[in-house]
Amino acid sequence: MDIKMDNFTTPSAASLESDCDLYAHHHTARILMPLHYSIVFIIGLVGNLLALIVIIQNRKKINSTTLYSTNLVISDILFTTALPTRIAYYALGFDWRIGDALCRITALVFYINTYAGVNFMTCLSIDRFFAVVHPLRYNKIKRIEHAKCICIFVWILVFGQTLPLLINPMSKQEAERTTCMEYPNFEETKSLPWILLGACFIGYVLPLVIILICYSQICCKLFKTAKQNPLTEKSGVNKKALNTIIFIIVVFVVCFTPYHVAIIQHMIKKLRLPGLLECSQRHSFQISLHFTVCLMNFNCCMDPFIYFFACKGYKRKVMKMLKRQVSVSISSAVRSAPEENSREMTETQMMIHSKSLNGK
């Protein structure tokens, strides 16, 4: 396969390919990217574990919204477990030293988190749409039964889309490094622009349209309810719901839009200019990918905040857990203080007694 590709590669293109360093920014990236992903790892893991603990403690009160949220939390936790290897990779200047098998697994976890997260956020918006706009069409029991089937379907769909990553090599030996899960590693894939454009439409554009339609309908319903019943507006329930909706949409757009826009515009450029793009264009795209992927991965840190502000029970439980932890720390400190003073007094008395014996 390599021989055939070499036959179709002109000498000028080959020299351009070899002279183009797409990782020239590694000196800056090896500082900023590990720092960013370390923050994502800590906040994402702690926040999502807290959310999972609260959900497990309230499993008897589970509903369709909680079910989708649980799967979203599991997806985020799964992603954070793969971050230490990525942090090491970026800290070494885009050099993967632990084999292609682990590289493939990391890539699998990354894409599972990305598109499982998008799908479950879409499911949440549809679920809220039926709960608020059409509450009589599906009762609570039916929504839970459907939610279980939908969650299973989403995981099967995402695994089906990402499992081919385990078949294809994800790492590539460069002159100075071994890269992992980088775009140039599979740039020669046949019909890649069309594959990525299709993935962007199914994995981003379609979910975004569904989310915007669902939440806009929910907002209209809330405004209509507020006009019919002024007490709901005075209670502040509608305002809180609207603020939560705005927050969810902003998080989705800010985290996922830049990455998919970067992919779409570069793939369109490749289709319009089938030949090898200039090195500066390719390098700019590579930098934009690293930046937008960092932004997209930050989404797993924002999900716990959505639960915190949107779910009254979750907020109350978290605050209760934190208060309990603080009270335990204070009580242990108070208990240890007299013990410390008593121990110091005993040691002082022993020293005095020892000196008096020596004096004799």
Swiss-Prot record:
Chain residue ranges for the region called Interaction with G proteins: 125-133
Topological domains, Cytoplasmic: 57-76, 127-148, 215-240, 312-360
Gene3D superfamilies the UniProt entry points to: Rhodopsin 7-helix transmembrane proteins (1.20.1070.10)
TM segment ranges: 31-56, 77-94, 105-126, 149-167, 192-214, 241-264, 287-311
UniProt cross-references to SUPFAM superfamilies, sorted A to Z: Family A G protein-coupled receptor-like
Listed InterPro entries: GP183-like, GPCR_Rhodpsn, GPCR_Rhodpsn_7TM
Chain coiled-coil ranges: none
Domain of life (superkingdom): Eukaryota
Compartment(s) of residence: Cell membrane
Pfam families listed in its UniProt record: 7tm_1
Phosphoserine sites (modified residues): S327
Keywords: Adaptive immunity, Cell membrane, Disulfide bond, G-protein coupled receptor, Glycoprotein, Immunity, Membrane, Phosphoprotein, Receptor, Transducer, Transmembrane, Transmembrane helix
Biased composition (Polar residues): 347-360
GO biological process: adaptive immune response; B cell activation involved in immune response; dendritic cell chemotaxis; dendritic cell homeostasis; G protein-coupled receptor signaling pathway; humoral immune response; leukocyte chemotaxis; mature B cell differentiation involved in immune response
Glycosylation sites: N7
GO molecular function: G protein-coupled receptor activity; oxysterol binding
Function text: G-protein coupled receptor expressed in lymphocytes that acts as a chemotactic receptor for B-cells, T-cells, splenic dendritic cells, monocytes/macrophages and astrocytes. Receptor for oxysterol 7-alpha,25-dihydroxycholesterol (7-alpha,25-OHC) and other related oxysterols. Mediates cell positioning and movement of a number of cells by binding the 7-alpha,25-OHC ligand that forms a chemotactic gradient. Binding of 7-alpha,25-OHC mediates the correct localization of B-cells during humoral immune responses.
Family note: Belongs to the G-protein coupled receptor 1 family.
Subunit comment: Homodimer and heterodimer. Heterodimerizes with CXCR5; leading to modulate the interaction between of CXCL13 and CXCR5.
Protein name: G-protein coupled receptor 183
Designated gene of the protein: GPR183
